[in-house]
Amino acid sequence: MIEPWLYLQKRYGESVASPEDADLIKAASELFVESLPGMTEADYSEHGAAHLRLGYDDGPMYVIEISRLGKATWEEWADQDYENEVCPPRSLQVTEQKALTLWKMLKEKRIEDVRKAFA
């Protein structure tokens, strides 16, 4: 069986391969706690989301994007090039804790649980 890969794309551009729970916690906090010195609303808006991707080289790929305003979006792709969408994206409003829970479920490959959360 081919092992999946997992990447966290943090709010300010840092990419983390095989993130630990601590990486997910920090990324969620960066989204919901906007307290960097010198940052303006426009700066925060420009860097408004982070996402976690779980996938296989030959597909499928799953993505949960979380925005700074608490919008979580679930995407399923047949490939890692974002070319063949399996189903339309689904969204819901989340708190920081719920965002973290969703990311952890994806990290643990609990795809059915994630689907249910977005149903």
What are these regions (language model features)?
Residues 3-5, 21, 28, 33, ...:
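Generic N-terminal initiation segments characterized by hydrophobic and/or small/turn-forming residues
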Residues 33-38, 79-82, 105:
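Short, surface-exposed, polar/charged, turn-prone segments marking secondary-structure boundaries
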Residues 2-10, 58-94:
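Intrinsically disordered, low-complexity regulatory segments enriched in Ser/Thr/Pro
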Residues 23-25, 48, 69-71, 81-83, ...:
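General N-terminal targeting signals
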Residues 1-56:
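Negatively charged, low-complexity tracts enriched in Asp/Glu with abundant Ser/Thr
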Residues 15, 36-38, 83-87, 98:
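Generic preference for well-ordered secondary structure
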